[in-house]
Amino acid sequence: MRFFDRETEFEKLREIEDLSHEVAQFTIITGRRRIGKTEMVKKFYENRTMLYFFVARKAEADLCDIFIEEIRTKLHIPIMDSKGMSFATIFKFIMELSQNQHITLFIDEFQDFYRVNPSIYSDMQNIWDNYKNKAHINLIVAGSVNTLMNKIFKNKKEPLFGRQTSTMHIRP
């Protein structure tokens, strides 16, 4: 995919990346389907280490197996057997790890955690709140279903309300 007129978005990603080395960053990227959100982030990080978690419509345990393999491959960290591991356990592990090294984590189709296990959002809130002040993490989440992304991040009754440090809406 070729990128045209994404300099503004790349500059914003660069600023966020730089900040994340000092203080934890939580960025939301929204925009309609097939507009290039995923490819834009992947292109920006093509020469940097980035964990990429795609939230497929699978069981949580199956997703965790895939996420653990991504951690092993990209960070070269031996991790215990992932059998029975939850996303909360993996996210906590990453947040703990980010206290000693910078990590960029990109979670794609973030709204689909609703189908996997809606309590993941509460778990993330608790873990984020407990670790963000000591972490050097660049957490990027992207979603294509605006109604769900708005519910997750803009509804005062939802656990991740107000947690983001940046929001990017990608237009054609």
Show where each model-derived region lies.
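Phosphate-binding site recognition
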Residues: 1-172
